[in-house]
Regions:
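Charge-rich, low-complexity N-terminal segments
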Residues: 1-67
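Intrinsic disorder/low-complexity polar-acidic segments
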Residues: 71-187
């Protein structure tokens, strides 16, 4: 048996602190899940629906609950025909469907909330971009101003996706860039 009373008191105290931290984290997970069920879920739904209505944004807000304590609230801009299609024959066209993007608030395994942007994509046309993580929050951190910022970032990113082009001026690189404005006397 290990003697824990000898000069190992520092190590034992370190271990005790780590155990206390672990217990606190596990208790927080339970508390975060309770807050989600008791109030946060409904608060997020209400705020997102309010912003959709207030801004006249064509979107749906719904809860996806395939697994307990991993629910997600999804603000979706919906699905539409992309305007592109494959002609099967003179009478039939197979339309490519465009998913317009979504803003997601999802519970994580530890009760915290991850906020994600799913970018638009067109089925069978390239690969969808991976979701963008806006942030991970403890329930008490999600105040109303955060929701407005998340929505602004979502709309900006979706707008940039829709307005994609490669006409952005190229960034010049090279040795002489810093010297381009210098007047060099000719010999």
């Amino acid at each position: 048996m290990i003697d824990l009373t000898s000069n190992n008191s520092t190590e034992l105290n370190n271990l005790k602190r780590k155990v206390a931290t672990y217990k606190e984290v596990v208790a927080n997970t339970r508390a975060y899940r309770d807050v989600w069920k008791e109030s946060l879920h409904d608060k997020i739904l209400e705020i997102l629906k309010g912003m959709v209505d207030n801004c006249s944004l064509e979107a749906t807000v719904e809860t996806k609950s395939g697994m307990e304590n991993l629910e997600a609230i999804v603000l979706s801009l919906g699905d539409v025909k992309s305007g592109m299609w494959q002609e099967i024959n003179s009478n039939i066209k197979r339309h490519l469907i465009k998913h317009n993007g979504s803003l997601i608030y999802q519970q994580l395994f530890n009760g915290k909330i991850i906020v994600l942007i799913n970018y638009p994509f067109i089925e069978n046309y390239g690969q969808p971009r991976p979701p963008k993580t806006i942030g991970i929050y403890r329930p008490e951190e999600l105040k109303e101003p955060f929701f407005v910022r998340h929505m602004e970032e979502f709309i900006s990113d979706i707008t940039n996706w829709e307005d994609y082009d490669d006409d952005e001026p190229s960034k010049r690189i090279g040795f002489d860039i810093n010297f381009s404005n210098m007047n060099v006397a000719e010999e």
